[in-house]
Each structure stands twice: as C-alpha cells, then as structure tokens.
A protein has these predicted regions:
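Bacterial N-terminal signal peptides
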Residues: 8-16
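Bacterial N-terminal signal peptides that target proteins for export
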Residues: 1-7
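Beta-strand-centric surfaces of beta-sandwich/beta-rich domains
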Residues: 23-202, 207-342
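Extracytoplasmic copper-binding redox domains, predominantly the cupredoxin/blue-copper superfamily
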Residues: 341-444
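Sec/Tat signal peptide C-region and signal peptidase I cleavage site
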Residues: 18-22
Length: 444
C-alpha cells in the first residue's frame, strides 16, 4: 500500500518532465472587410481572430490587402495605425483602460520581433480586438482587409514579456498633441512624461510610433543619471518616396520606419522606478496631432540588478527600411480641389472673393459643401468661429501657416481660434479635404 503513492509520484514526475512536441508556426489572419469611401478617413474597431493556439508569439506584422491578398498601396488607402489589444490580460499603462496593447504598427511599418527565448504568452481562448485608422487617397471607394502574420511557438516554455505602451504626453484621452511652431530652426519641442515601472525585469525589445516632424523618441533612466536606455529614432523616405506623392495630402507624412531595439540580455529596470519617455519634435513649424509612443517589452526578472551597470553590449537596432533620411524634411501640405476632369489638384486658394472684415470675431459656416467665406481677411488678434451646421463629423486643421490650428472632430457645435500672429493660414477639414478648405489672411 505504501508503494502506490511513490509510484504515482514517479508517474506524475515523468509526465511533468516529458518534453512536449515543440513547433513554430507562422499564421496568416485577417480582419475585415472594411469599406473606405473616396478620400475618407475611418477609425475601425473590431474583434479579431487570435492564433487559436496556446504558445508564445515571437513575431508579428500587419498590412492592408485586398480580397485576393494583394497589398494595398498608400496611394489608395493608407494604414495610419493599428493597435492589437489582448482582452484576456488586464495590465494597461493607463489605469481604467481595458486590455493590454501588445502590438502596433502604422506608417512606419513596425514589426514585432523578440530575442530568442522570449515570447508574448497567448492562449487559444483569448479575446483580441483592434483599433485602427485608415486614410483613403483615392476617389473610388475601396474594400480592404487588415492582414496580419503571427509567428507562434508551441509545446515549449519561453520567457514571457509584458508589453507596455508609454506615451510622451501621458494618459490623456486623446493620444496626440500639437506642436505650435513658434520656435526658431534650432529649437526642439520636447514632451516628457515619467512612467513608474510596475515590475522588476529587463527590457528586451522596444519599438516606437512617431509622426512627421519628429527628431527622436527616447526612454531615459533618472536613477542612473538620466541615461538613454531606449532610442526609437525615425527614418524618413527619400523625396521620391510614394509617401510624398499621394493626393490629397490629409496629414504631414510620417517616418517610413522607426528603430526597433533588441537585447537578449535585457536592460534592467526595477519595480517602482521612474522612466522618462520623451518625444522630440521640430519646433520651427507647426505639426498637428503628433504622437510619441514607445512600445516596451519587459521580461519579469526579480534578479535584475538594482545598480547602474553598463548597458548590455548586445543592444542592437533593426529597421524595416534599410535606407532613409534621419532628419525630418520640411513638408508643406497643399489644399486640394477636384478638377472638372475628376483629378485631385493643388490650389493656392479656394474659389470665391475675399471677405475683408475688422470684426473681433467672424463666424464661418462650416459644412460638407465648404467653409463660408472660403477666403477671409481679419485683423491681428481677431478670432474665427467655425460653426458646423450639418450632421457629419468635421474639423479644422492647418495645412500651412505661421502657427498651428487643430480642432477635434465635431458633430455640430463650433470651434473658435484667436489669431495672434499675422500671416496666411490655409486650413482644411481632413475628413472632407476637397470641399472644405479655406484661406485666412491675418493682417498686421
């Protein structure tokens, strides 16, 4: 009778140590279809397929494709950004938000890659969702799918990573901020937020999301002299790159790549310590609705040193683009109209006579048909109130001018901006860019 527990214990031990059959699989999954009308910007959200497997994700990427699986070029529909969120996990850098963001990409074509031995733990019954932004640069409506590839390792244990989405502008509801453009060419706009680490461990991978005008995105460690431990530098396309030749221009083109940092050894961080995340943008010109978000992947390790040892020698940066420009190019966003032949053309000003006023505040009727008056001259210090008079969503966005003007999207209501710097301001609604554009001349 005494032998039985021993025998059962031996059997249990053998089962526990028996190696499972390890396998690596690359899955191709899709979300959609998503219908995008001509020159439309949409923000789709959807429940998406997970891997259907128990294992560890080691690689992931995403792109827009058509029904036959062919890549959709950005001169048709642009994937501005997408974030995949794991509803089964409950860590979020911003309290109160549901789920854990674990992969994101956009114009920079970021690809998730983890060092050997590390993976993001996933289960076959986990629930995933996506939030995204697509921008049409074509007159014709198009149906697109978000296709994503996931490499998953099953049948063996790996070191799990905790994804952390850390923004330079903190946990505001709106993940973007504006750079006003009131500096000289040598000045930078620095936006920094300190984030407290929830675990002790090692940063083994880090990516980043930036917009046009960005110089840098970095994470520094104050307890070690504020040294830089993560750098997600941008890489911009050559002047001939397609990103600079799509019309209408709905926003300032962003980087075509950002540096993805890897280290199998990992950079030690301690639970409770602060890390500073800084977005570094050009300050000499306005840049609207910019983002600076670093994506950290932290492996828990209670043995991670508490000192300030030299950074690991195996830190390296990989790029999805081999070549490009490191400094942000100057880009002027034109206002555009649809010609009589059905082509998108850049114009200096919309149709209509100048309306000259000395009033302290001018109300502009704003609807799908356009801004009225479309050409307005006001004195320095005066305000303009755009009154949105139809049921559609609209906004006011600077195309070019001395200072930034960037409203939220409105369904009705109004938006007021006071002009305090003389000059010529070209504005448009990026949701309806071919009909809703305006020139405001501010007189000294």
């Amino acid at each position: 009778m005494r032998a039985r527990p021993v025998l059962l214990a031996v059997i249990s031990l053998l089962v526990a140590v028996a190696p499972a059959h390890a396998a690596t699989k690359r899955l191709t999954l899709r979300a959609g279809p998503f219908n995008v009308n001509g020159f439309q910007t949409v923000w789709p959200t959807a429940t998406v397929h997970n891997t259907g497997l128990n294992g560890y994700i080691t690689k992931m990427d995403a792109e827009l494709v058509d029904a036959r699986g062919r890549r959709v070029l950005i001169n048709k529909v642009m994937l501005h950004h997408v974030v995949f969120i794991d509803n089964a996990r409950h860590y979020n850098s911003c309290p109160g938000r549901k789920g854990t963001p674990f992969f994101g990409t956009g114009e920079e074509n970021e690809k998730l890659v983890l060092p050997a031995g590390y993976g993001y733990r996933t289960h076959k019954h986990d629930s995933w969702r996506m939030v995204a932004m697509f921008m049409s640069h074509h007159l014709q409506a198009k149906t697109v799918y978000l296709q994503y590839h996931v490499t998953i390792v099953t049948g063996r244990r790996m070191t799990d990573v905790l994804p952390m989405w850390l923004r330079a502008d903190g946990c505001k509801v709106e993940p973007a901020y504006d750079v006003n453009g009131d500096g000289d060419p040598a000045q930078h706009n620095l936006q920094t937020t300190a984030w407290r680490m929830p675990v002790t461990g090692r940063i083994v991978a880090a990516g980043g999301h930036l917009h046009g005008g960005a110089y840098d995105l970095r994470v520094t460690q104050p307890r070690c002299g504020d040294r830089t431990i993560v750098n997600n530098a941008p890489r911009y396309g050559a002047p001939s790159d397609l990103v600079y030749h799509v019309f209408p221009v709905l926003h300032e083109p962003g980087p075509v790549a950002t540096g993805w940092q890897l280290s199998k050894t990992g950079i030690p961080v301690r639970k409770g310590e602060l890390l500073n995340v800084t977005g570094d943008y050009d300050q000499s010109e306005p840049h609207g609705r910019v983002m600076a978000i670093t994506h950290l992947y932290v492996a828990r390790d209670n043995r991670a040193p508490a000192g300030c040892e030299p950074l690991p020698s195996d830190i390296r940066t990989v790029w999805t683009r081999a070549r490009g420009r490191s400094l942000p190019p100057r880009v002027t966003i034109p206002i555009s109209r649809l010609s009589s032949s059905g082509k998108v053309v850049s114009v200096d000003r919309p149709p209509g006579d100048d309306v000259v006023t000395s009033a302290p505040d001018t109300v502009v009727s704003s609807a799908l048909g356009g801004f009225g008056p479309a050409n307005l001259s006001i004195p320095d210090g005066a305000s303009v109130t755009w009154a949105f008079t139809d049921a559609l969503a609209h906004n006011v966005s600077l195309a070019s001018g001395p200072r930034g003007i960037y409203s939220p999207n409105f369904h009705g209501g109004s938006y007021t901006h006071q002009f305090t710097v003389p000059g010529t301001y070209k504005v448009f609604c990026y949701l309806h860019p071919l009909t809703m554009n305006q020139v405001v001349t501010v007189r000294p």
